[in-house]
Amino acid sequence: MSAFAQPPGAGRKAVDVAIVGSGPTGMALAALLGCQGRSVVVLERYTGLYNLPRAAAFDDETMRTFQKLGVAEKMLPGTNVQRGYVWVNGDDEVLLDIEFDNPGRCGWPAQYMMYQPHLESVLDELITSLPTVEIRRGMTVESVDQQDGDDVLVRATDVEGSAYLVRARYVVGCDGGNGVVRQFAGGELDDYGFFENWLVCDFQLNRDVPDLPTFRQVCDPAEPIAIVNIGPRFHRFSFRLESAANREEVVHPDKVWPRVATYLTPEDAELVRVANYTFRSCITTQWRHRRILLAGDAAHQMPPFLAQGMVSGIRDARNLAWKLDMVLAGHPDSLLDTYQAEREPHVRYITEKAIELGRVQTMRDTALAAQRDAQMIAARKANQKPDKLRYPALSGGLIANHGDMFPQGLVSTSSTTALFDEIAGTGWLVVADGPQVLSGIAEGDRTAFTEIGGKEVIFGLTSMFDGAPVSDTAGVYTRWFAAHECVAAIVRPDGYVFGLARDAAELAGLAKELVAAVAPVPSRPPAPTA
């Protein structure tokens, strides 16, 4: 049978994009593409939602993505805003006490603790409502075949063993660190060599426990512990295990309760989940092989010490969705080459910082831990605060300059006040301080910008011209433009800045560079047929 031959009686589907895996990354990507009208099928091996928590937190950038999807408010009942976090040593002395920004640069609180089943139920409800998106559960992907044509054929079997075929323009593997798609994408795993065994215990609270820490790292060399809330009425205790620990024995409830006795009793809470985890850090060397792409844990895995694992996967989805949409609309396929070029350095930075942080938090050497404690306590007494961790801007790829996230603050029009994205939208934007800044853009470039869905957002930050369409209600943009010494920015559909301009001439040059980079190819193949 040829690679694209169809078994007798097989079900079949033809779509723009096939997504393998319906965790947060896969569902976010499906929703983003579906909201753009792209036909999508999601193949998931589980027969239903995985109704147990895994990830514990997400940040304001992720909430901004949920805002774009129209589900930010629906996410809130499954979250708690996290105001900060504390490190203590084995003697309960405070080593570090950090406050999170509220709001963060994306207009939402910087850190949310969340109950993942709620998040996934909201995303599932959304993608189920989208007419161009189909999710098929209980599907085991057997192969992903691409030949010299313009399609990829995905072969899967359902729980009854029946064959199902999907012919897609592109396939995205969002099927996790042990997923199947990566073997068809090629490449190798670049392993950082970081391995730690942890026991993760989740509890559902029966009553309020006033002294229960909401986000605490116990840096005790005898047994490092992380204590976090994971949304309303749920709490997680994670214990770093010795390499010699009996991993089958430690999961028994009668072994778990003594570990948490300082904080919880069986009257306080119900133990709902116990799992052994091996935290590791690795990144695949190839995120794209022609029409096969990888996202989320299928492309990279990191330890949880910065709470950026799920967040990084959703960043992947946000980066990839608009590029796939443009390519499917006839823009250069080479846009997809910018995906790994932009995302991999960002992921590597976060992974390396998470490893660095984890090694400090979970020291087992008592002498080194005592030295760490003395240094951190002395710094705290001297009121020396650590620098806030800032993730790097994007570089390379489709970035002219800057490459950082464009902020989101409150803005006003003549009829309403809302967060910036609600007013401006989230396609390509030129954001300018006054209309005169736009005067140098060539008419052809302006037309081409409009044809890719581009819009103009005009403030009156310094010029204060009469009738500015948008007012900087909270001063976010006045401060941002001043800090960057610019008068305009071109913002990408994922919220990252393509480039800053100091004057009208620079803006005209940026517009010309962008239009040339994304110019449609002369022709494109028709959509696949079943």
Swiss-Prot record:
Gene deletion effect: The mutant bacteria is unable to grow on GRA. Only 25% of the resorcinol is degraded compared to wild-type.
GO terms for biological process, alphabetical: 3-(3-hydroxy)phenylpropionate catabolic process; resorcinol metabolic process
InterPro entries from the UniProt entry: FAD-bd, FAD/NAD-bd_sf, PheA/TfdB_FAD_monoxygenase
Keyword NAD in record: yes
Stored Gene3D superfamilies: 3.30.70.2450, FAD/NAD(P)-binding domain
Reaction it catalyzes: resorcinol + NADH + O2 + H(+) = benzene-1,2,4-triol + NAD(+) + H2O
E.C. number(s) listed in UniProt: 1.14.13.220
A UniProt-annotated Pfam family: FAD_binding_3
Domain of life of the source: Bacteria
Role of this protein: Single-component hydroxylase that is part of the gamma-resorcylate (GRA) degradation pathway. GRA is initially converted by GRA decarboxylase to resorcinol, which is hydroxylated by resorcinol 4-hydroxylase.
NCBIfam families noted in UniProt: PRK06183.1-3
Protein name: Probable NADH-specific resorcinol 4-hydroxylase
Source species: Rhodococcus jostii (strain RHA1)
